[in-house]
UniProtKB/Swiss-Prot annotation:
PROSITE patterns: RIBOSOMAL_L22. GO terms for biological process: translation. PANTHER family: CHLOROPLAST 50S RIBOSOMAL PROTEIN L22-RELATED, LARGE RIBOSOMAL SUBUNIT PROTEIN UL22M. It comes from Mycoplasmopsis pulmonis (strain UAB CTIP) (Mycoplasma pulmonis). It comes from the Bacteria. Keywords: Ribonucleoprotein, Ribosomal protein, RNA-binding, rRNA-binding. HAMAP family: Ribosomal_uL22_B. This is Large ribosomal subunit protein uL22.
Length: 110
């Protein structure tokens, strides 16, 4: 049984979040937690929070054994983009795109 936890509209770009997602996909949960704690990226603590939520959902809501869980899938999708303008010289302005993403972590038993 797959149990998932997701977090939507996180203020991190999907390209940068997918770099971290590739590190702990298909790992055991204990190994994934240690990988995320030692990764120096902005999205690593966000993924750690989602992973802990997925583990808690599996144990409390579905009665699965926490020691047998592994990360079965990690999905990173683009969220809505915030569009801002930065003024420049001679009346010009350039667009700044503040990208967001939707993050999802799925765990299941081996």
């Amino acid at each position: 049984m797959e149990v998932r936890a997701l977090l939507k509209t996180v203020r991190v770009s999907s390209k940068k979040a997918s770099l971290v997602a590739n590190l702990f996909r298909h790992q055991s949960t204990a190994n994934a937690i240690s990988i995320l704690k030692n990764t120096n990226k902005k999205s690593a603590p966000i993924f750690l929070k989602i992973l802990n939520s997925a583990i808690s959902n599996a144990v409390n809501n579905h009665g699965l054994d926490a020691s047998k869980l592994y990360v079965s899938n990690v999905m990173v999708n683009e969220g809505p983009t915030l569009k801002r303008f930065q003024p420049h010289s001679q009346g010009r302005a350039t667009r700044i795109l503040k990208r967001t993403s939707h993050l999802s972590v799925m765990v299941s038993e081996r």
